């Protein structure tokens, strides 16, 4: 499969090799729809999370049966679409650190050979859902995340932790603590997730996190970017999701800063505007609306990135 470039940090030279990708099940549940969206955008890679293969129920790429996985691989290869990152459910916001660790290790064991077969360099992991009143990371979380990290690294694969509804995402301080305790772990920064997550490093009542502050403290560890934008809605006590650059996620500022620092890895879209992956109450969205939203989101991000890169090249004379 395709060899993927590594992100660069601190290099002012602007490169043209940035990869645009997206979390496939935000475009369609079925593998055919995910491939269709990728090809319509003239992209070459998917970030695969949930997928439905004909004849099998939808599941995460590391959980679907071997026969379903084989079929998915054949369809991807036939279409010339690579998998940039595995959007795994390993230790995610639906799991507690009190759950049996054997189940987590079984997911890791299934994911590794599938990543290798697809040539995926990155696997997104998390660090379990904290209790409502927790503000410290338990030692057992560090132990489990380190073991999972080591298993992927030993296989030549790079785990990346996402700031989300997990212990490592409780604040940028918690994130740095997790990275310190788990050598070799890297970060995937989600621009919108700080908007709806409380900053548990501060006294109660916990304020919501600041996306820019989180980015500035974590950017040296970031090798992958999830592009999502949102605005906090006090009336709903939840986030409303927006086009990139139109919310409070500081998407334009983060992207401008990333480009200035030489970031040339992937920008992966996760619109959330039609359906929210972790919203158990969300109804099945109209397939056409889901697809059209994904395509327009991707085109808007490409336009933003091109404008920022052009302005930066003009300013630096490169």
Residue ranges and their predicted role:
Residues 43, 48, 81, 115, ...:
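A structural motif
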Residues 4-30:
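Boundary/entry segment of secreted carbohydrate-active catalytic domains
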Residues 62-69, 101-109, 138-146, 172-173, ...:
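Charged helix-capping and loop-helix junction motifs
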Residues 11-16, 45, 86, 149-248:
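Acidic/histidine-rich catalytic cores of soluble enzymes
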Residues 47-73, 128-133:
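Glycine-rich, proline-tolerant flexible connector loops at the mouths of alpha/beta enzymes
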Residues 266-274:
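Short acidic/histidine-rich active-site segments
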Residues 3-8, 32-39, 71, 75-78, ...:
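Active-site acidic/histidine proton-transfer and metal-coordination neighborhood
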Residues 22-24, 50-52, 89-92, 127-131, ...:
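Active-site-proximal loop/turn and secondary-structure-junction residues that shape catalytic pockets
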């Amino acid at each position: 499969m395709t060899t993927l470039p590594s992100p660069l940090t601190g290099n002012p030279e602007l490169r043209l090799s940035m990869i645009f990708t997206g979390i496939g099940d935000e475009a369609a549940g079925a593998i055919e729809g995910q491939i269709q969206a990728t090809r319509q955008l003239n992209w070459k890679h998917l970030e695969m999370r949930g997928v439905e293969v004909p004849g099998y129920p939808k599941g995460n790429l590391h959980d679907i049966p071997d026969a379903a996985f084989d079929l998915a691989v054949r369809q991807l290869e036939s279409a010339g679409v690579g998998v940039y990152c595995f959007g795994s459910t390993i230790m995610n916001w639906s799991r507690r650190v009190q759950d049996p660790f054997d189940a987590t290790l079984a997911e890791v064991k299934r994911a590794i050979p599938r990543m290798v077969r697809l040539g995926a360099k990155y696997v997104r992991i998390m660090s379990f859902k904290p209790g409502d009143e927790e503000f410290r990371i338990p030692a057992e979380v560090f132990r489990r995340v380190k073991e999972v990290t080591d298993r992927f690294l030993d296989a030549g694969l790079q785990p990346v932790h996402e700031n989300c509804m997990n212990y490592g995402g409780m604040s940028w301080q918690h994130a740095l603590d997790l990275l310190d305790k788990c050598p070799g772990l890297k970060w995937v920064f989600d621009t919108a997730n700080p908007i709806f997550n409380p900053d548990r490093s501060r006294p109660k009542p916990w304020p919501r996190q600041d996306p820019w502050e989180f980015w500035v403290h974590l950017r040296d560890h970031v090798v992958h970017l999830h592009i999502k934008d949102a605005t906090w809605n006090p009336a709903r006590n939840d986030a409303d999701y927006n086009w990139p650059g139109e919310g409070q996620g500081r998407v334009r500022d983060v992207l401008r800063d990333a480009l200035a620092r030489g970031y040339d890895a992937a920008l992966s879209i996760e619109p959330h505007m039609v359906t929210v992956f972790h919203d158990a109450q969300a109804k099945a969205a109209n397939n056409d609306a889901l697809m059209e939203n994904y395509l327009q989101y991707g085109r808007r991000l490409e336009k933003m990135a091109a404008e920022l890169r052009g302005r930066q090249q003009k300013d630096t004379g490169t």
